[in-house]
A protein has these predicted regions:
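Polytopic alpha-helical membrane-helix bundles and their juxtamembrane interface segments
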Residues: 1-237
Length: 237
């Protein structure tokens, strides 16, 4: 297994633009009440930087490794979803929801179905049912079904990410753990969005949502480097 220190040395510099773009978003903190193409650009910029992070490994890397390709495609849908959510009060919330639904399908595909780990799947199904039941009484119209489907998709994505971390069998890698933590943070971010939009105002909701969201996307993107072997990193040292 590649050492975390080795990977940080090799991958860290490629993530510098992402960290800078994230800082720009939080420093500018553009008001959500005045949506614009500029605010959409600033919000999407960290995700664009994650595109660059994956592309920095080479186009051949993306083309030849299915999981990296799926994650890259998921980031594209995520950026489009982010742009739609800038204008959510103008009727584009559902559009953003659909884009992120596609992103979760792609991430699930990237994480794969092995090991299956039905026990973790059952736990995720139980937890997602609880979360949806908390939202259900506040939902109406098509959102009753849309939120149910979205909850199922993100729970499935989280299941596949968590299932990859086999701590008890000592078969885990730091990149699988990265995907696991990223998926859980994505659930936290999206559940906060749902509670804040449909139930009641959540204190510091935007900070919680965006901090967990950007961290989740970064960790999921980092999991793509699982495709690289130890020799690749030795060449970079």
């Amino acid at each position: 297994m590649v050492s975390p220190v080795t990977v940080v040395k090799c991958e860290g510099p490629k993530l510098v633009p992402f960290f800078k773009a994230t800082c720009v978003y939080f420093v500018l903190w553009l008001p959500t009440s005045s949506p614009s193409w500029f605010s959409a650009l600033i919000k999407c910029l960290p995700i664009f930087c994650l595109w660059v992070f994956l592309l920095a490994h080479g186009v051949n890397f993306l083309v030849s490794h299915r999981s990296a390709k799926m994650i890259f495609a998921g980031l594209i849908f995520s950026a489009v979803g982010d742009a739609f959510l800038i204008w959510q009060e103008q009727g584009y919330f559902v559009h953003g929801l659909l884009m992120f639904a596609f992103a979760h399908i792609l991430y699930s595909s990237a994480f794969g179905m092995k090991p299956l780990d039905l026990r973790t799947g059952a736990v995720m199904a139980f937890l997602s049912s609880i979360l949806y039941s908390l939202l259900y009484s506040y939902l109406s119209g098509p959102f009753t079904y849309l939120v149910a489907v979205y909850t199922a998709l993100i729970a499935f994505m989280a299941w596949r990410a968590v299932a990859g971390v086999q701590l008890c069998n000592d078969l885990w890698t730091w990149t699988k753990l990265s995907a696991c933590i990223g998926a859980v943070l994505f659930v936290v971010s999206d559940f906060t969005i749902a509670v804040n939009k449909f139930c009641f105002p959540v204190p510091c909701s935007r900070t919680i949502i965006m901090a967990t969201y950007y961290t989740a996307q970064m960790l999921i993107s980092l999991s793509a480097v699982e495709c690289r072997d130890e020799d690749d990193y030795r060449k970079k040292k």
